[in-house]
Amino acid sequence: MNRFSAKEYNYKILFSSNNNIDIYPYLVDSTGDKSIYSIGPLHGRSFIVSCKGDRYIVSKGNGLSYTQYDFLFTGELSSLGDDTLGLLLLEDATRDFLVGQDVAKLGVKINRMECVIELDKKLFLPNGHILNPILLQYSVECPYRICDAPFMDQQLLCLEIEKWERYNTKNYRKKHLIAADVMINNLRVMHDNNILHNAIHEQNYTWALELLDFELGRTPNHPYKKSDYERHVPSLYHRELFQTYVIINYIAWVLNEEISYKEIDNLFAEYGFNIQKYKLKENYYGKN
């Protein structure tokens, strides 16, 4: 875990889950007198800003945890684009917060959204735009994501895995099957409610099996603003099966557990997902 200096700013609240939260309006700044922490190289713009009881408070959009610069402008999509590494855009923060709340209401375990705030500071982008930094603040049971396994203390990893027994209603002996059951059930719940996460991978699940990062997602309450994006939604559900499959495989490898792909396919089938229907046909006439 690496410490970074940060500076505190005045702010206004754009969204809040409740009034009883502490807010951490910090940006990375080598001259600042606040401390924030990055727990690994894959958490580019997310930092631990505090701990409350058994939960970690995370802030997203506070600047970069790599390079000597706090923000790096890329201007993707067009010359007028505002995409900037280290920065969280208002539209993305809003969607992350609101879609996440929709998913949580269905019983899927996610990060607990706390607030979206706008800082009283101006950032001057090379395209001529002036933005105020936006921060998304949330809490998690475990700050380490599945992809962080190479950087975790093994004792801490084992402690997180032991907690999975609370979900082991089917008495699995292999730990990756417990995780698989949780994740596939999450898919079933989301897809049955016309929810697309659209970014399921090992960086967006924690070792407490919390699903994160909903800024690319959509729900019936918060559909995509562009009709062309909405039109493609039905075709995107399928790939989430295989994105989840990759995470399950990753976990099995990390835990050095032998994985049976037939067993995983059968587990998908239990939840109504037929992996076999995606296999290629052996000849032109469709005979398998």
Regions found by a protein language model. Give the residues of each.
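Regulatory N- and C-terminal appendages and interdomain linkers associated
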Residues: M1-G40, S65, L80, K174, ...
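Conserved ATP-binding subdomain of kinase catalytic cores across diverse folds
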Residues: Y24-K163, D192
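Short, glycine/acidic-rich beta->alpha junctions
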Residues: E91-R95, V182, H197-A199
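Conserved hydrophobic core/spine positions of the Hanks-type protein kinase catalytic domain
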Residues: V99, N185-N186
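Catalytic activation segment of kinase domains across protein kinase-like and atypical kinase folds
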Residues: K121-Y138, I195-N249
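Intrinsically disordered, low-complexity linkers and terminal regions
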Residues: W164-Y167, T219
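Activation segment of protein kinase catalytic domains, centered on the conserved DFG
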Residues: N168-I178
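Protein kinase catalytic-loop region centered on the HRD/HxD motif
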Residues: R188-I195
